[in-house]
Design a protein with these regions (language model features):
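RNA-contacting regions in translation and RNA-metabolism proteins
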Residues: 1-218
Length: 218
């Protein structure tokens, strides 16, 4: 009897994980079930299955408290018998992308340093639509909702351009850029006013680093 019950439990678990396999890369809402020294356990969906948030998927600016509701990015579903696991994240760039996609589906690229700053490039296929304005929302309502969900993380919303040099100039926002010159394959030099140099580089190089990741250029 015990063997039968064990088999039934294993079958139910396998079916549950199989149902979650198509949730990879999606946003889910859950409750924090458990907090230990390293990992965070998050209860997901109606079936109350456990998702695990590893240290590298947590953001330094957030405090995780049992019972809190939060949205997580489903990073990976590993279905391997007793070692089956659903890995979720609050640090993945995909989290910011999915939060905005609930309102604005035209996101081209995202670069992120969790808990500090995100840069997101957007575009619109309709020239009559202000893509940045649609993303920000009336009086900043949409972007503020995402910022609040991310615990105050700064978000730069940038208009994507097919011209890589124009895109680089926009990606260095909030600094103004005088010119961008290509110096090699996927490499360029941006010239900024002297009084904007520190803004273009950012604290500990963060702004320049995020711009490079966003554009794929260095």
């Amino acid at each position: 009897m015990q063997v039968i019950l064990q088999k039934l439990h294993e079958t139910e678990r396998d079916n549950t994980f199989s149902a979650f396999s198509d949730k990879e890369g999606e946003l889910m809402e859950g409750f924090i079930r458990k907090v230990d020294d390293k990992n965070i356990s998050v209860e997901l969906g109606e079936k109350k299955i456990e998702g695990v948030m590893l240290p590298q998927d947590q953001t330094p600016a957030e405090r995780y408290v049992m019972g809190d509701r939060l949205k997580v990015f489903v990073k990976r579903v590993k279905n391997s018998g007793k070692n089956s696991q659903i890995l979720v994240s609050r640090a993945a760039p995909g989290l910011v992308k999915k939060l905005f996609e609930e309102q604005v589906p035209e996101i081209k690229a995202v670069s992120r340093e969790p808990g500090h700053r995100t840069k997101m490039a957007i575009c619109s296929n309709d020239t009559r639509v202000d893509a940045v304005g649609a993303c920000v929302g009336n009086k900043g309502s949409r972007v503020n909702a995402v910022v609040e969900e991310l615990g105050g993380e700064k978000i730069d919303i940038i208009l994507w351009s097919e011209n890589p040099l124009e895109f680089i100039a926009k990606a260095l926002s909030p600094a103004s850029v005088i010119s961008v010159t290509q110096t090699g394959e996927k490499s360029a030099i941006a010239v900024v006013p002297d009084d904007k140099l520190s803004l273009a580089i950012g604290r500990d190089g963060q702004n320049a680093r995020l711009a490079a990741r966003l554009t794929g250029w260095k």
